[in-house]
Amino acid sequence: MLQGLGVWDWAALAGYFAILLGTAWWVVLQRNKSSRDYFLAGKNAGWFVIGASLFASNIGSEHLVGLAGTGARDGMAMAHYELHAWCLLVLGWIMVPFYTSSGVFTMPEFLERRYCAAARWTLSVFSLLSYILTKISVTLFAGGIVFKALFPDPIIGGLDNFWFGAVFMVVLTGLYTIAGGMRAVLYTEAIQTVVLLVGAGCVLLIGLHQVGGWQRLRDVCQGTPRMVAVTSEVEVAQSTQRTLTQIEPPAETGDIPEIAQDAEEFLDIEIEPGAEPALELDVTQPAESVVVELESAGENREQTAAAEDVSAPQKTRRWRLFLSREKLDFFNLWKPNSHPSYPWFGLLFGAPIVGLWYWCTDQYIVQRTLTARNQSQARRGTIFGAYLKMFPVFLFIVPGMVAYGIATQGDTRLFPVLTDGGANQAFPLLVKHVLPVGLKGIVIGGLLAALMSSLASVFNSCSTLFTIDIYKKLVPNASETHLVWVGRLATAFIVLLGILWIPVVIILMKGSLYDYLQSVQSYIGPPIAAVFFLGIFCKRVNAAGCMSGLAVGFILGVARLVGEILSRGNGSAAETIAMNPFLSWFTGTSFTFMAIWLFVASSAVILAVSLLTPKPPKEKTDRLTWSGRSAEERAEARAGWNKWDVIATIGLVACILSIYIYFTGNMFR
């Protein structure tokens, strides 16, 4: 574990934990006297704390690991989800006035006031289950990957560091979340935001320097052959540093010599005098790929005495690098509609539906704005958070591309990034092998900040949902002190569930981490988004329509998820699905397309049932719909912003459009 970390690294880590735990302890000493204090931080937070908390709670370990992984595998495609910063503007300018004027603690509570008690219970239970199965599980898995990549040697006995890291983060974060409540989450996240931005910025700048600068990264990741797979064979004793052994390609390879030249330039590896690139058609891979065999010294070679004498026998690892004739297109946001994960039509129309659900209606996010002292502070917090939200495009996705570029230029320490399923290791491997001693501690602190902020946010949101939406309904006469302690016990129980879920996480997370998260959210979010937005903008929508839309949307979403799992199996169910055109489409179409269909189906059911049933009573629409606002509420909302808020909003939209323009290639394919 100690290998590669210097005194200053450990000093930075120690300083980070000292400041973090000191802040948490200071918050605990402030005492949470009521449920309002514990769950909404006393409703006294300012715009900076709110914006930083929005960013830190969203940017968790799944972003550091998952976004960098998608950057190493598909380039800028996943940036669409990070450019949903504009959804925060919708939250601040449109949704917050309804939430704050209604005085609710939770999003399910808002649904009860707009529709019925059944809507509140349904959303509360479903949200709790989805948090445990998605947010907690994804964060724990990503945390385990980070610890395993940074510290491969066991810390305690023979315990795998994947397990140690996941359990350690869960317990530590759970302790200060239980003790300090929402106020502890807010103020520790403000610190973690600074650490995270500084740490990720160091990785980006030093990584770009290592790969040769921005233009070199574009050259490597745009228009060159794609490295489609890497396998590592057994280590052998060898007296060479880096050689490419010659294997004659078959005569019928056609244009293989051209690819051979591309491969040599693509890898940019020093070839020992007399040696030539080893290229052949790989019979186990598609005919459109070739193989480069590379023998290189082990990653710790530079730390051995043998490194000074290249004639001495050294342990080397033989790598087989599979190059596809497909050209890289990493700097293009728009993929063809045939792309399995990121078709441009689905990203343009389906992904925003998930973004509006997440940023405008999910308890995990909206709870931060409910802590504001007034609407003005809440709105400015969302604007500030939206600006911060654009940073991941460059701080997390681009480093993944940098890791790919460094690996394809011959740095075998980063070759795991090129392996099947190994892209998720891009960010932690950059930290481990590219950063100099002294900066690693700061960046590892940023990684830990992402882990802990994600867990703290979901723990507090879960305890709030359980205590306010479920327990308080069952025990309506519970005192404020009693509710605070129930919230703490609920958090402790969530922590325990998180630990017990770790073994299942390993099974669930086979493949791309971020794809898994976005696909599940695409099956959960659309019906909830439809219920909230139609409820606010259409007074005619009633409780019957709400419950019908939620039921249809959830059933279709679960059916898609189960069908997708069955279709990937080897049993009779997979054969049945493959033979049925509709089932094959339903289980195989991109999750971005499915988000569109789920939203359309849920909205159609909500509107149809509402029109066929009586209008909602006046108390369900007054102050809770756009046209039902009073003159006083409109005046209060108008008094909460000035020209600088408008200028900041326009500036954000301009920044987003600029990024879209810069990274747009041939879109309609």
What are these regions (language model features)?
Residues M1-R669:
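Membrane-embedded helix-loop-helix hairpins and adjacent transmembrane boundary segments
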